[in-house]
Curated annotation (Swiss-Prot):
Family annotation (PANTHER family): ALDEHYDE DEHYDROGENASE-RELATED
Organism listed in the record: Polyandrocarpa misakiensis (Tunicate)
Keyword annotations of the record: NAD, Oxidoreductase
Reactions accelerated catalytically: an aldehyde + NAD(+) + H2O = a carboxylate + NADH + 2 H(+)
Residues of the active site: 99, 132
Residues annotated as binding NAD(+): 76-81
EC code(s) of this entry: 1.2.1.3
GO biological process, one term: ethanol catabolic process
Pathway involvement of the protein, from the record: Alcohol metabolism; ethanol degradation; acetate from ethanol: step 2/2
Name of the featured protein: Aldehyde dehydrogenase 9
C-alpha cells in the first residue's frame, strides 16, 4: 500500500502540472523516500516532488495549515480527517479530498456459489492482515445458507497460514505496529463481551511479534462494536 497510495497521489497531481509535498505514514516512510530518489535520478526538477517523514500533529499539521498549499489529499482515519478539514478551513480554505476507512458489509445470498463466496469474503477480510480501508470485516448471510457459510468460513480461517511473511507459503504476517495489534485485540474482547460467538482464533499467535490468529465470530449483535 505505501507504493500504491503514493502513485495514486503523485500521478494525477504531477500530470496536471502541480508540485507535491507528501507526508508519508510514520510507519512506512522508506518506500516514498526511495521513489523520490528514483524521481531525482529520472530527471524531475528539484522541488517538484517533496517527501516529508514525520508525525501527523507536526509534519501533517504543517501541510494542512499552510497558507500556500492549495489542495490536500488525505488517506487515513476518519478522526484525523476531521482535524485535516478543520485546519484547511481555518487557514486558506484549501480544497480537501479524503479517502477514509469504512465498514460496509459483504452480502451473501442463498443462491450464491458458497465456496466462491467464502473465498471472496475470506480475501476481503484478511487481505493485508485486515489493514485495508475497505476490509470486509462484516458479512451478512441469507438465513437459508447461514450455517453452512459459517462452517466453511471457519474451516478456511483455520487453514490460513500465519508467520514470517517472507517465508514461502505464509498467507498472513504481523500487524504493522503495537497500536494496531492492541486495537484488534481490544475489538476481539469487545466481540466476546457483546455476546457474539467466537468460533476460531481470538488471541495472539506465537510468543513474539504482532501476530493475531485469524478470527471468526458468528451471531454478532448489530449494535455491537464489531457488528456496526
Amino acid at each position: 500500500f505505501p507504493l500504491l497510495m503514493q502513485a495514486w497521489k503523485l500521478g494525477p497531481a504531477l500530470a496536471c502540472g502541480n508540485t507535491v509535498v507528501m507526508k508519508t505514514a510514520e510507519q512506512t516512510p522508506l518506500t516514498a523516500l526511495y521513489v523520490a530518489a528514483l524521481a531525482k535520478e529520472a530527471g524531475f526538477p528539484p522541488g517538484v516532488i517533496n517527501i516529508i517523514s514525520g508525525y501527523g500533529p507536526t509534519a501533517g499539521a504543517a501541510i494542512s495549515e499552510h497558507m500556500d498549499v492549495d489542495k490536500v489529499a488525505f488517506t487515513g482515519s476518519t478522526e484525523t480527517a476531521h482535524i485535516v478539514m478543520e485546519a484547511a478551513a481555518k487557514s486558506n480554505l484549501k480544497r480537501v479530498s479524503l479517502e477514509l476507512g469504512g465498514k460496509s458489509p459483504m452480502i451473501v445470498l442463498a443462491d450464491s456459489d458458497l465456496d466462491f463466496a467464502v473465498d471472496t469474503c475470506h480475501h476481503g477480510l484478511f487481505f493485508n492482515m485486515g489493514q485495508c480501508c475497505c476490509a470486509g470485516s462484516r458479512i451478512y448471510v441469507q438465513e437459508g445458507v447461514y450455517d453452512e457459510f459459517v462452517k466453511k468460513s471457519v474451516e478456511r480461517a483455520k487453514k490460513r497460514t500465519v508467520g514470517d511473511p517472507f517465508t514461502e507459503g505464509i498467507e498472513q504476517g504481523p500487524q504493522i505496529d503495537t497500536e494496531q495489534f492492541n486495537k484488534i485485540n481490544r475489538m476481539i474482547e469487545e466481540g466476546k463481551q457483546s455476546g457474539a460467538k467466537l468460533l476460531c482464533g481470538g488471541k495472539r499467535w506465537g510468543d513474539k511479534g504482532y501476530y493475531i490468529e485469524p478470527t471468526v465470530f458468528s451471531d454478532v449483535p448489530d449494535d455491537s462494536t464489531i457488528g456496526s
